[in-house]
């Protein structure tokens, strides 16, 4: 009996000792400290499980603050990127989305929709960058994010000219890298 009690006390001491040790969490880099994504590190997960689904009919703000819906973009394929100013991978992939928007302007519309809660915050962040092609849309209620049902930023969805989903990438991506080029060539080539 004494041996059992000593064994039990020893086990408790080990367990309690383990609970007392707290590891210091590794700090996440600030969004402004993240560099342009490297292909292997920022290879978001390709998801085709929503292929053929219609664009969500939610309303958010265009770059001028007017009400806007994705349905206004039908007629040409559109790549919709959900992002936020505080999201490191989002910020890292933004320059590559800007490059893509310029290179594919004739075949593809690219819009970036911030999930931040303030137009002033997004506009202030945007003013410090020199994007040539992209303009910041805003979904402060996160309605588009909820419609996409990923819970992850960045999330990027490609819709065909009829407004049907082709695929989505959940997580960061180098949008002017070889993987993105292959995905887009297959999708856009099939629509010509």
What are these regions (language model features)?
Residues 91-129, 140-146:
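Structural microenvironment flanking redox-active thiols in thiol-disulfide oxidoreductases
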Residues 47-52, 57-78:
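A short beta-strand-turn-helix
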Residues 74, 82-99:
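Conserved redox-active cysteine motifs that mediate thiol-disulfide chemistry
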Residues 81, 111-113, 135-137:
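Structural recognition of the beta-strand scaffold that forms the well-ordered cores
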Residues 1-57, 192:
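N-terminal targeting signals for export/organelle localization
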Residues 17, 63, 161:
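Short, ordered coil/turn segments that flank beta-strands lining enzyme active or ligand-binding pockets
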Residues 76-78, 82-86, 152, 162:
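Short pre-active-site segment immediately N-terminal to redox-active cysteine/selenocysteine motifs
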Residues 125-133, 138-189:
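Thiol/disulfide oxidoreductase modules built on the thioredoxin-like
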